Amino acid sequence: MIKKIAFIALLISTTSSFAQHFRTYDWEKNPKLHEINKEEQKESSIAILKKHIVEYVSNVISPEPKLYETEHTIIRVNDDNGIAQHNTVYIPMYEVRKVVNIKARTISPSGKVVLLNQDNIKEVSNVEEYGDFKIFAIEGVELNSEIEVLYTVEKNYEIYGSQTLQANYKVKEAQFLFITGKLESNVKAYRTLETFEEVKINGDNAQLLTIKDIPGMVEEEYATPKANNIAVVYQCFTEGQNITQNMFWTNVSNNVGRQFFPETIVSQATEDVNKIVEGKTDLTNFKKAALVDIFIKSNYTIVKNNNQELSDLNYILTNRSSSDYGILKVYGQYLKALDVEFEIVITANRFLTKFDPEFFVPGMLRDFLIYIPSEKKYIAPDRFEGRIGEAPFNILGNYGLFISSDFEHYFSKIIQEDPDYSRIRRDMNISFNNDFESVKIEQDQDYYGHWSETSRAVLSLSTEQGITEYKDYLTGSGIEDKEILSYEAFNTDMNQLEYNIPFKVKTTISSEELLEDAGDSYIFQIGLVIGTQSELYQETERINPIEMIYPNRYNYEIIVNIPEGYSVEGLESLIIDKSYVARNGEKTAKFESNYKLEKNKIVITIEEYYKTHEFDLNRYEEFREVINAASDFNKAAILFKAVE
């Protein structure tokens, strides 16, 4: 019996440790500073090496393999900002069973090596809601020194995982080593041309991705930098298991379908639906869905916690309180009761994650929408300010998993059905008092699509200060001394039964700073009347693909009344024509302004549009010229000169 126990103990120890790569992987025994070029010396910090190892190890006493992750980084810090960014190390403890080892050291310019004092490693809980961390400060960090960190953790087995290889500083060499031995697995890299190489590690099958000279990710306007990082996703299955991507997606479709497509309508839902449509006839599917959306967002509260009752349909209907997941059950009940066909869409915020239909990772399943196929319109259940219409702008352009009532699924890019959904129409009538002391601007504006949604939400939900700031935007941002003579807004209610009803605003303002005395003449800063404009001026090479918040269009007509006894000069500054022509020959972005003289009036027309939210990175300069054209118009001025 004793021999049997000893044999089992030996078996456990050998099967869980045999050929494990992390046990032999180590840093250089005699470290030296690495060579970096003059340009790299100008950076606050540079990653000499950023290596991540994911190692799945078969375990004969359990069907689940063991999972080890090793992180090895060498960072050169060139200034105080670099030191501040890297001299404290955080090791996430999410799903960590145990810490195998943690090592760190600094190598000074003189070659002095300072090792981490293990007593300095502390454990902190729930750091900014990111979970628990091991944390330690790096000692002995000098300018132009290197910080090297190497640690391994054993984690709870999980089929899926992901790892970001890019950082907000340059990485000279990034490596991702995926060791799975005889286990079935899949791995995929995003946003790089480099591919995985099949290698052997201690006789085990492995795949290695090496990428050199990764530029630091930067925040850029019209971009989704977090979602654009070079990254890896992977899957590794238990012994003898091999699940296809379609099997993963089918499983999700079945589980979600059973939750949100009801077989029967409960009595409380029937009672609610009768109230929703009471006195209303000849309702289209759009109006039915709109009434449901309005009722739910006017009567239910979404609560952010893990209370299981908030996902129970009867509890939700009785208490009018739900989780963002549970509220989908209410939509399902009401829409089915009204015979409105719908589909559930699972997708992700494109500013955070790019949804990939070809590789299943649960981290992509972040956001739910409801799609009404007959109307080609979406409901965003968790967006209190939104109502049925086009897809939310943070989802637009991402792919989604569409699930129908029979639990079948398909993938589709989430597009904007109406190309002119978001647009602004603005008419202005500009006049001057007799002595050119001030200018009066009368404006009539219509805001459609996301513009109208934002306007209604701000005026309905914002603080008094927020409303004041938005009123400033609506009456002419950038005109510092303006006096608001009149202001009236229409269609301000967030609850609209018709598709894309415009938010309207009529205003009258006066300003003195738009005029400048020039002897017997007056300079009128006419460009400022269109409000503050974006400018794209970038000295460094563009990193991110171009993604606008959403497609949009602006159509302005500006009438300037010429005072009697004056002529006008400098009108040529009002003529601008910049465009971006797609590969198929269609203009997909344009800014065009022009004018004509009609007796004592200058009639200025401006047309600016962006028919898509995605533009080619390789043609950034053309896109930039269109964006900057509006800014150029904003600087335009004309001269009123007294007629002799």
Segments from the language model and where they lie:
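Surface-exposed, acidic/Ser/Thr-rich flexible loop segments
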Residues: 85, 92-94, 140-193, 498-579, ...
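Long hydrophobic segments that form regular secondary structure
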Residues: 396, 406-516
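Hydrophobic/aromatic-rich core segments of domains that either
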Residues: 279, 290, 325-410
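Early extracytoplasmic/domain-onset interaction patches
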Residues: 20-91, 416-434, 438-445
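Solvent-exposed beta-hairpin/edge-strand motifs
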Residues: 29-31, 90-116, 171-190, 458-487, ...
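Cysteine-centered nucleophilic/redox motifs
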Residues: 73, 147, 176, 292, ...
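Secretory-pathway-linked proteins and extracytosolic
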Residues: 22-33, 154-170, 175-306, 419, ...
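A surface-exposed beta-strand-loop module
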Residues: 102-166, 194-229, 282, 429, ...
